[in-house]
Amino acid sequence: MLVLIQRASQAAVHVDDEVVGQIGPGLLALVGMEPGDTEAQLQRMAERLLGYRVFADEAGKMNRSLRDTGGGLLLVSQFTLAADTRSGMRPSFTSAAPPAEAEQGFNRFVEICRENHAPGVETGRFGAHMVVSLVNDGPVTFLLRP
């Protein structure tokens, strides 16, 4: 499992010209599922995502988490994150979870995040062609692994 987080002033996901998820200040998280991702990994990643300190405190240091700020969380499935890009000129997706496994894992991850982040969690639409827009704040971007 990989999660690419970006601190955002705002972010939205459109499918077929319809907004399916949007947030104000918070985090956009692109989520790539890998074969065999476990419940423990999903739980750990949710804890890291909600507790990772990427927001400024009063002194301007990145010392506050999404949990601290009460910001929005927009989760978007993105199987291309799990691509193997080490050789050649074309990515291989054999390291990404098969679609049914990835959807089940992603949905469980969303559920865990919703249980632990009262301000709310928005999502894209699994498997759909999505148009994702964000106003990147910083930019601040991190790749998390459980």
UniProtKB/Swiss-Prot annotation:
Keywords per UniProt: Cytoplasm, Hydrolase, RNA-binding, tRNA-binding
Single GO cellular component term: cytoplasm
Pfam families named among the record's database cross-references: Tyr_Deacylase
Domain of life where this protein originates: Bacteria
UniProt cross-references to SUPFAM superfamilies, sorted A to Z: DTD-like (SSF69500)
Localization annotation: Cytoplasm
Enzyme Commission number: 3.1.1.96
Protein name as catalogued: D-aminoacyl-tRNA deacylase
Organism for this UniProt entry: Stenotrophomonas maltophilia (strain R551-3)
Name of the coding gene: dtd
